[in-house]
């Protein structure tokens, strides 16, 4: 039976803007209050989907969440009509209004953690939507992400959905951005590598903590997901992220490492006690594991964060053994990083034999590269057929979506534009049409 890695990219929403809401995300902070271009952001994302689809990969999308989040505004004390809520929030707490308008659901690597059926005891694909409690603007995504995934993967013969982990600091969960799966191929059972930044309960005196920026993922959350997903404990590793890397802007592990099948591309300063982590991987691997460790002399952690090299997608084309690195254009523009990539491609000791650079500037300026924009869902033929087909990409659907973006998206969005009630109605009109395009039914709160 065939097995695939379905890339589910987040479709960028109309309220994409730069507000600097994410502590520890250096790009987000550095570009705060600058002017965004939501139309360009969405079209760059669609072009990424088109490129991967035309390479022969299975490609889907997750739609934007409803914004502004009027219910969150209400919870925060802003009452009245939608226009009154927006006006009051803008005048007294514009940063809260910005959070309620956030389009951060575009980074679907944080939407959930997904386990392949070949790895689970009940042979079903398991999903746990991330609670994302570390940031206000992201925590609001959790319930709707769960609802979306339950709709798209609704057949209980193949798919198992778990409740969100408790919304507490002890079980803070950031989704697949802190999870890697290593295997001989997508069809084979794999090693699940969960990465955490802190342990909250019990004795954790032997592990360090970041000082400058907060660690988001807890070990307790990762362990709970592994248990709920019925993963074989002998095939699971829990690794602590290097706190020094977190303090340099590595807020998720997918900013400092990337895995695909039997290849693990990782910076030498990614993990606390890295030699032990890599030894565990080698010990558990019953396949020819290829670890490509990039030294700090080749690329510093700071340079990795600036260019998002490790937030590239590493992909295997159908019926091929070689791999392609899908990297942000910022890597090509940095001579040191490009030289490193050229060396990887030229090295016959690893399967990476080409690189493709993507322009994702709008997302990158908010701290999201190619890997941030996609949730990996491992599926076999039966599972792929059993899911909702309306969100699966082909060129015809991409053409329709491109016209939809041109119709509804602004080419410029400033923080002051969030005070315009008309933006709310533009968003609702667009989402109403989108649900028809993707055959999602009345899935948004305003449609019920």
Curated annotation (Swiss-Prot):
Highest taxon, organism lineage: Bacteria
Gene Ontology terms, MF aspect: N-succinylarginine dihydrolase activity
Pathway: Amino-acid degradation; L-arginine degradation via AST pathway; L-glutamate and succinate from L-arginine: step 2/5
Keywords recorded for this protein, A-Z: Arginine metabolism, Hydrolase
Active site, renumbered: 174, 252, 372
Keyword Hydrolase: yes
EC code(s) of this entry: 3.5.3.23
GO biological process: arginine catabolic process to glutamate; arginine catabolic process to succinate
Pfam family, one: AstB
Keyword Hydrolase: yes
Known function: Catalyzes the hydrolysis of N(2)-succinylarginine into N(2)-succinylornithine, ammonia and CO(2).
Family: Belongs to the succinylarginine dihydrolase family.
Name of the protein in its database record: N-succinylarginine dihydrolase
Species name: Legionella pneumophila (strain Paris)
